[in-house]
């Protein structure tokens, strides 16, 4: 690595680490004594997540453990040795779970259709089961700011709902707390960090599934907006934490029904 790249890496790492720490603090993601399961896919974002948590583990005033977990779904061409070899250099506890979900998905989903939805649901269930069985207190996912914004627009445009990915949530089955420490970090930052660190990236399309065309459309739309109006993504992201229920139409969030003439002050 050249001296220039070393300086770039140092600056970028500090920047990402600061944003990660801010997100963790603002949403109380990690507590003293936690056992954090980092879900490692072999993609740039999960590598970045693991690196940031390992750095914070050294600096934080509290103690917490980190367990890296990868789910080998038996996709054809999956390089089984890549993640174990990488994780051994980190001297941390790690587990490779082997489940042939690939065959199940291929049997259920017609050829040419996107398999990501079913695949992700099966993967989530397996990882949640592992977390419960191994006394994991928090499940850490590598979703970043752009993922959160894109999910907001996917729900807005295609589901008719105002929702996204929270930085922290209790899973639907109430068995696990899920955290997203990279919530304040942009995809541009994780991509550049991955290149500078030279992570051993595992392709995400080994299954042969087509990209979700709706997500591709949303991503392209947001990138065009950002090119025309820099900081647009930051403004949208800020809006997700600046919501006024009384200015919306959801009767579950605000009691419109009981606003009456008796409330008028003159």
Swiss-Prot record:
The keyword Cell cycle appears for this protein: no
GO molecular function: 4 iron, 4 sulfur cluster binding; ATP binding; magnesium ion binding; sulfurtransferase activity; tRNA binding
EC number assigned by the record: 2.8.1.-
Residues that coordinate or bind [4Fe-4S] cluster: 116, 119, 207
Cofactor note as given: Binds 1 [4Fe-4S] cluster per subunit. The cluster is chelated by three Cys residues, the fourth Fe has a free coordination site that may bind a sulfur atom transferred from the persulfide of IscS.
Keywords in alphabetical order: 4Fe-4S, ATP-binding, Cytoplasm, Iron, Iron-sulfur, Magnesium, Metal-binding, Nucleotide-binding, RNA-binding, Transferase, tRNA processing, tRNA-binding
Pfam families: ATP_bind_3
Primary localisation category: cytoplasm
Coiled coil: none
Quaternary structure note: Homodimer.
Protein name, per record: tRNA-cytidine(32) 2-sulfurtransferase 2
